[in-house]
Amino acid sequence: MDETIGMKKEFHDISVGDIEVGESAPVTEDDKMLLNLGYKQEFKREFSLLAVFGQSFGSMGLCPSLVGSMAFSMNCGAGGMVWSWFVGATCLLPIAFALSELASSMPTSGSLYFWTAYLSPPKYRAFLSWFLGYVLALAYSTGFASTIYAAAGLVQATASVANPSYAPTKYEEYGIYVALSFACSALIVLPTKFLARFSSFNVVFQICTILIFIISLAASSTSETRNTGSYIFGNFENYSGWTNMGWSFILCFTTPVWVLSGFESCATIVEEAKNASKAAPIAIISSLTVSLFMGFCIMITIAGTMGHDFSSILNTPYGEPVSQVLYNNLGKRGAVGVSAVLIIALCFNCSALCLASSREIFAFARDKGLPGSWIFRKLTPGGIPLNAILLVNLYTIIVGLLMLVNVTAISSIFNLAIIAFFISYSLPLVCRLLFNRLNPGKFYCGKFSKPISIVAVAWLWFMALMLLFPSYQNPNKVEMNWAIVVLGFTVFFCVGYYYLPKYGGKTFFKGPVKTVDENVTEGVTVDFQADHVSKEDDGKSYN
């Protein structure tokens, strides 16, 4: 396949960045592909393959995120912890392959939102891209908020280990949450070149965190805390609020799907990446695969060093089960030291998520999809979408008010983030299957492409439905799953705003809008708005 879709002539007289005619600066294949998709180059391409991988790997923040959400996977004993991770994470691989094909074909920061628009017929394009834009913004923003909440919980647990008399009020907990939100966001207002270096550094730091965690627990375990292989892989007990063991095991999938959600986030920074159509699919698949096996090792380590008193771990006074495991094996100082490293790693994870969220909001605002889009599509002189970053923080602060209700209410944001991500993942794949409009990029699965997408959609819909269920079999209004409330409000606002008479999105939103000047695109086919025929089944090779 040609390096660009629908490209009719080469560009040798276009200046990258300001897109002016008459300059002699070289134009890369990345710039040509972006031009063909209808967008001028606004970001600087500073992200190497390692940095792109670091964005996805860092967004997952494997070890600290797993530690912060461990309680969800402990509903079925040690065996349930270990196997729910392996099964849940493995089932995400078809999704990674399916999304990698789209990322390679359409490397733009709009990612899932743009892909949905591109793959849908003109009749449905505007509404579907509008809907997906809002759900995806909800997914990334809630993913950031839930990770900030996990970080705040880890900070409080560490403080409790260091000082057993420490007992923060819910308002103090909320204050820690807000402070962490701004602190983690501050890191990504720096220039793109720094962000690329930070992303690469984050890979090294996250891997070092994993090694520190595993080695410290394995080396310090005693006969009282060390468990046998039969216990690690074969102990199944029901500690959930449901009587059915099988359903309790399915609920354990919350940990792997939450921790690993965001593995495609590198697609939101492809306009800042070099050789984006290759780098994005490599980063998506490799980051998920590495996280799957490293996470499995972490789970085995925790299950092998937690002892047999599962109830005391679950009901720890520190608030975080893994904090109790660290204390039992390492003592106070060791537990605080390892927890400090986990907190730093989790904050880096939060920064990576905020980066992805702000880029998606910028891309959606660039296409006039948000109220006040002209505000959120602005870049600073350094090329940073500062207003979009502030919007992410505003949402995080508001949704964090659920902390003042109860733990069950705020815990629902974990489910909400996953559900929103899974809806966002599934919609472009459904369009790709129904309308057969994919022009394959450099990464393509050939005859296995459609079967992989079908399996991916089936798993996404199953998990999205499962995560709407409450944590308890007969919940009261306090124990209900609040995810459906926030998701329902978002869908209601999205659809209502779109069809609002005279002022709604239907009157002005047409889907992704090209930002390339006409004098630049002269002689170029930017065929996004035109109907097109898929090249997927023409018998040619696209690798």
Curated annotation (Swiss-Prot):
Entry-linked InterPro entries: AA/rel_permease1 (IPR002293)
GO molecular function: amino acid transmembrane transporter activity; gamma-aminobutyric acid transmembrane transporter activity
Cellular-component GO terms for this entry: cytoplasm; membrane
Glycosylation sites: N275, N406, N519
Family: Belongs to the amino acid-polyamine-organocation (APC) superfamily.
PANTHER family in UniProt: AMINO-ACID PERMEASE BAT1 (PTHR45649), GABA-SPECIFIC PERMEASE (PTHR45649:SF6)
TM helices/strands, residue ranges: 47-67, 79-99, 126-146, 176-196, 198-218, 249-269, 282-302, 335-355, 384-404, 410-430, 452-472, 480-500
Swiss-Prot/TrEMBL keywords: Amino-acid transport, Glycoprotein, Membrane, Transmembrane, Transmembrane helix, Transport
Organism encoding this protein: Schizosaccharomyces pombe (strain 972 / ATCC 24843)
Subcellular location per the Swiss-Prot or TrEMBL entry: Membrane
Record membrane topology: Multi-pass membrane protein
Annotated GO biological process: amino acid transmembrane transport; gamma-aminobutyric acid transport
Official protein name in the record: Uncharacterized amino-acid permease PB24D3.02c
